[in-house]
Every structure is written in structure tokens, then in C-alpha cells.
């Protein structure tokens, strides 16, 4: 088995600072914070401290935060929780598959639903949206890293921050937002739902109490996510520079490559399509040289399938690989990857 020296895959191991404390978190976080006994009271104190830590990092109030044990459930809660019978729903052709599913469900129920198109940079083209409508707004795309300008319509907004995380917080008003713990090297299975307009939001799930969410998240994983976030924010960030180095190398050294990622997008994501090679063969060949990359859609339900994001942008789909540049990446690893990529492409093209 070849040792992976450069891991550019989107999935990431838990931040080492959180990993080292996992046993402690599970020893402290097992009680139910809602109960009255001493151990539960201690757990409740920990939970509140974590809530305030997240509130500061995400630039929200503590009472606007809901923790989720299933991040994908947050899309349904954030979107359907704002909808009333007379709202129109607008989403974009580059949104996540979970958004597509909610939009299709609402359309099947008879709601007026519109899919907004994007240009070749992946920027959403707003059209005919009023203040009474709900607009789903992806802060940054999880494949290309391309970011959106602030929405102009004045509609209610659900901000999808699952890819952007704390690397780019919304600079516009929104009613709900969703974050994924994995975006800052936290544990999987933890989402953070923000409900800023509580008066406009109603729990769309079957329920018989005033709880806004199921509350089935793991407190130990919540503690781990908070530590991961704190350490993630403290790390130096050289990713934009490394991304530009890769783009510059490819542009100068490898022909017939379409780079879908804008240079001014998030530094952590890069999507390229290379003419004359099969993506899966390129992925496996790079792995043989010690480099792991992704291919296909970033949406879990469509892994290794052609990217609907690139198709919506009018970009080539064949020969596409995706890189996630992590904070611990070094210039040396990037240089070695570029050399390996050039060699693999030449090999697969038969040059």
C-alpha cells in the first residue's frame, strides 16, 4: 500500500486537539443536561459554555443556536421552518442535493418553486424575487470554492454555510443558517442550525412540545467540535497562496485544463477538469504516487457521479478532480503534487 503524503480529500480526520481529549469528553458528557442531578447540572454548564463559544465564533446569539445530531436534517428545518402557504421558494442550480430534495418536495405539494441559474463563475442570477419569498443562498460552493455576493432581493434568506463554515461568515442579513462541524475539522454527525428570526420560524417536524429540534446530538462530540473550532481559528492560513500556486502551475505546465475555481474564492477548494483523461483513472494514478484527491460531485448522494455544479456553470465535467487544501498543507507538498499531477496526466494521455 502506498503511503499518502498529500491528502487533498474533502473528508478530514478530527482535529488533533479534539482527538486528544475525546476520552475526557465522553467521561464528562454522558449525562443528560436536562435532568436535575449533579452530573447533569455539570453537563448543562459545559453545554452552555460551548453554546457561548460557538455564538462568538459564528457571530450570533446563544439563543439563536440549535445543535443537530444529523446535519442534513438542518436543511429541512432551516427551509421549511420559514415557509408559509403563500411563500415562493427560490434555490439555485448549484445547491446541494439535500436542497434539491426539499425544493422538489415543496413543488410536489403545489408550492411555486423556481430554480435560479448561475453564470460560468457559479454566481447566482437573481430574478423576480420579492420580500415575501424565501431565497436559499449558498455562501460558498463546496466543489469550486466560488463565493456569492450578498443577495439583492430583500427576500427571507436561508444561508447555507455548510461548506464555507467559519472561513467566510455571511455578510448579509439572513433568517436561518446551517453550519457543518466538519468544515472546521470537527466531528461528523453534528450540525449547527441558526434561527435568527424566531418569530417567523416554526418547527416543520411532527412534535408535541416547544422544542425546536429533536435534540439527539452527542454532547461529547459537541465538546470536541468546540475544541476543534477554537484550534482551527488559531491556525495560520496559507491556503489561498497554495491554491494560487497550483493554479499557476497548471496554467503554465498542463494544457487543456478548465479551472472552475475563481482565484478569489475560498482558498480551501479547487476544481479542475482535464481534457483527455478519465477522472477515476487519474484519481487512482495519483494515489499510487502518494496523493489523494476527490472526483465527481461533492454531494454525498452522488459521489463519483458527474458534477451537477459544473454542468450548471457550463463547465466541462469529464476529467474532473477536486482538491481540498487543508490548513496543515505545506508548500513542499503542493510542489510535489503539481509534479505528480503533470506526470500522471502525461501518462494517461499517452504523451
Regions found by a protein language model. Give the residues of each.
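Pyridoxal 5′-phosphate
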Residues: 1-351
Amino acid at each position: 500500500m502506498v503511503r499518502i503524503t498529500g491528502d487533498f480529500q474533502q473528508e478530514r480526520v478530527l482535529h488533533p486537539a479534539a482527538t486528544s481529549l475525546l476520552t475526557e469528553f465522553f467521561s464528562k458528557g454522558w449525562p443528560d443536561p436536562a435532568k436535575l442531578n449533579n452530573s447533569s447540572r455539570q453537563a448543562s454548564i459545559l453545554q452552555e459554555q460551548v453554546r457561548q463559544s460557538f455564538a462568538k465564533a459564528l457571530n450570533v446569539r446563544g439563543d439563536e443556536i440549535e445543535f443537530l445530531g444529523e446535519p442534513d436534517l438542518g436543511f429541512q428545518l432551516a427551509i421549511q421552518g420559514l415557509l408559509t402557504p403563500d411563500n415562493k421558494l427560490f434555490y439555485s442550480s448549484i445547491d446541494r442535493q439535500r436542497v434539491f430534495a426539499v425544493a422538489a418536495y415543496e413543488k410536489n405539494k403545489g408550492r411555486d418553486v423556481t430554480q435560479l441559474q448561475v453564470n460560468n463563475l457559479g454566481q447566482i442570477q437573481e430574478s423576480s424575487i420579492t420580500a415575501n419569498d424565501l431565497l436559499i443562498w449558498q455562501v460558498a460552493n463546496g466543489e469550486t470554492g466560488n463565493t456569492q455576493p450578498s443577495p439583492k432581493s430583500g427576500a427571507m434568506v436561508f444561508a447555507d454555510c455548510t461548506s464555507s463554515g467559519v472561513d467566510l461568515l455571511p455578510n448579509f442579513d439572513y433568517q436561518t443558517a446551517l453550519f457543518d462541524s466538519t468544515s472546521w475539522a470537527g466531528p461528523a454527525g453534528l450540525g449547527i442550525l441558526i434561527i435568527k428570526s424566531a418569530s417567523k420560524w416554526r418547527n416543520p417536524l411532527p412534535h408535541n412540545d416547544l422544542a425546536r429540534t429533536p435534540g439527539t446530538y452527542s454532547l461529547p462530540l459537541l465538546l470536541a467540535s468546540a475544541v476543534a473550532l477554537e484550534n482551527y481559528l488559531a491556525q495560520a492560513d496559507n491556503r489561498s497562496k497554495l491554491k494560487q500556486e497550483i493554479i499557476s502551475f497548471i496554467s503554465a505546465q498542463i494544457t487543456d485544463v478548465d479551472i472552475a475555481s475563481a482565484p478569489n474564492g475560498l482558498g480551501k477548494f479547487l476544481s479542475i477538469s482535464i481534457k483527455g483523461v478519465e477522472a477515476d483513472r487519474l484519481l487512482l494514478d495519483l494515489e499510487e504516487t502518494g496523493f489523494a484527491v476527490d472526483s465527481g460531485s461533492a454531494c454525498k448522494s452522488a459521489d463519483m457521479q458527474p458534477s451537477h455544479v459544473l454542468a450548471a456553470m457550463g463547465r466541462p465535467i469529464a476529467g474532473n478532480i477536486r482538491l481540498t487544501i487543508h490548513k496543515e498543507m505545506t508548500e513542499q507538498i503542493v510542489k510535489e503534487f503539481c509534479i505528480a499531477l503533470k506526470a500522471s496526466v502525461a501518462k494517461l494521455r499517452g504523451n
